[in-house]
Amino acid sequence: MNINTYNLNEKLSTEVTKIAKDSISIFSNLFGEYPYDTYSVIASDFYIGGMEYPTLVMIDQSLYNEKDKFLLEYVIAHETAHQWWYSVIGNDEISEPWLDEALTEYSTVLYFEEKYGKEVGSKLIKTMEMQTRNHSSEDIFKATTQYKNSIDYSLNVYTKGALAFNEVRKKVGDEVFFET
């Protein structure tokens, strides 16, 4: 498989390539083989973090920051997870955005758990729980256009959705969760 990275920060190029390889490997082990021959991570003028397409993700070049590599890794892992959740397993992203975004966000937690240990995954879950504490009555099962604003959308679709998958995992256990 060919992994390409394009960015203007030469110091981070090797790390970005490693993150891309690690995320493809981890997600292939968890969800099934990556179905394409190539994968590209491209830095771009993109104000919302990242965007996914089959075999290609665009990452906001402002995230290529040596002082905060965690956020860069998080966004690359998240956008890479979209290669499964939306690209391989499609859904209606407008009517049911929680399906791919919640799975993708939870997959990002799984990436960090697999790469750095369960404690890191648990910290990410705790952060998500704190972020959503005051939004617990909001429904995640709405169309994209039904959210009040981008913060409401993000907290519900990404964060609460990921927490819902975490609750399922806790209820059924790892063996059943990852087998299904």
Predicted stretch roles:
Residues 87, 168-171:
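Alpha-helix C-capping/helix-to-loop hinge sites
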Residues 29-33, 46-48, 130-134, 170, ...:
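Glycine-rich, acidic and aromatic/proline-enriched surface loops and short helix-turn segments
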Residues 97, 101-163, 170-171:
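Acidic/His/Gly-enriched intrinsically disordered linker/tail segments
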Residues 174-180:
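Short, intrinsically disordered, charge-balanced linker/junction segments flanking boundaries
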Residues 70, 163-166, 179:
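Positions in alpha-helical segments
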Residues 1-83, 87-96, 107, 147-151:
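Juxtacatalytic substrate-recognition/specificity segment
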